[in-house]
Structure formats: C-alpha cells, structure tokens
Amino acid sequence: MSNNIPAELKYVASHEWLRLEEDGTITVGITHHAQELLGDIVFVELPEVGANLAAEEQAGVVESVKAASDVYAPIAGEVVAVNEDLPSAPETANSDPYGAGWFFKLKPANVADYDSLLTAEQYAGEVD
C-alpha cells in the first residue's frame, strides 16, 4: 500500500480519512489525494465542538488557491474536539494530512459504522 494511503486508517469516497483512537473517538482529516487535488490550502473552517453531525453532513470547508471544497462527517457523531492549530496554519493539511493536519474528532453515534468504511485498499481503488 502506498505511503499516501496508510493501511491502518479507514476512508470514505469523499476523501476523508478516519482513525479509531484508544478512547473510542474517531479522528477525521482529508486524504493526501484530496490535498493534492486542492493544491495549496489557504483557509480551513472547522465544525463547532458539541455539534451533532449526521453521516455525510457538511462538517467544514477547506479553501485552496484552486478551489473550495466541503469537508464531510464520514459517520454520525458528536464533535468532541477540533484542531485549534489548523485555521492559523491551514497548509498543515497539505504537509501532514494524516498527522498534524487532522480536522476534528468525533464521538461516534455507533462505533460499528467505522467498520463499514473503506479500507486503504478499497480507497486506493477509488482514486486510481
């Protein structure tokens, strides 16, 4: 599997990645492929902590020199944290999309939803 699609994460076709954390929360960000398509990211709008999001509901916005794109909640849940550093350093979503460039954390409404998402191999098939 490519370094650009880490095998330990889950994915959705709208180019968000998810990581199940030890505390049961799910960290969400945009994929390497998404940041490549967008180009240099210049603005990020994140959801409010405490917001209850439905699966596939718009959770934020990312703007680049090329385009603006919505960021979606891959599964239903409550936003329990946002990456406070991202709005002042949106380029982090380009340079470290799977690390410091994460967007928000969800407390999933149903953690089993995580298991039904795309594997790295399946997501790679979506973007090839």
UniProtKB/Swiss-Prot annotation:
PANTHER family: GLYCINE CLEAVAGE SYSTEM H PROTEIN, GLYCINE CLEAVAGE SYSTEM H PROTEIN-RELATED
Naturally occurring in which organism (per UniProt): Neisseria meningitidis serogroup B (strain ATCC BAA-335 / MC58)
The protein's name: Glycine cleavage system H protein
Cofactor: record remark: Binds 1 lipoyl cofactor covalently.
Organism taxonomic ancestry: Bacteria, Pseudomonadati, Pseudomonadota, Betaproteobacteria, Neisseriales
Positions of modified residues (N6-lipoyllysine): K66
Record key words, sorted: Lipoyl
Gene name linked to the record: gcvH
InterPro entries, per database record: 2-oxoA_DH_lipoyl-BS, Biotin_lipoyl, GCV_H, GCV_H/Fam206, GCV_H_sub, Single_hybrid_motif
Homology family: Belongs to the GcvH family.
Gene Ontology annotations for the cellular component aspect, listed alphabetically: cytosol; glycine cleavage complex
Gene3D superfamilies: 2.40.50.100
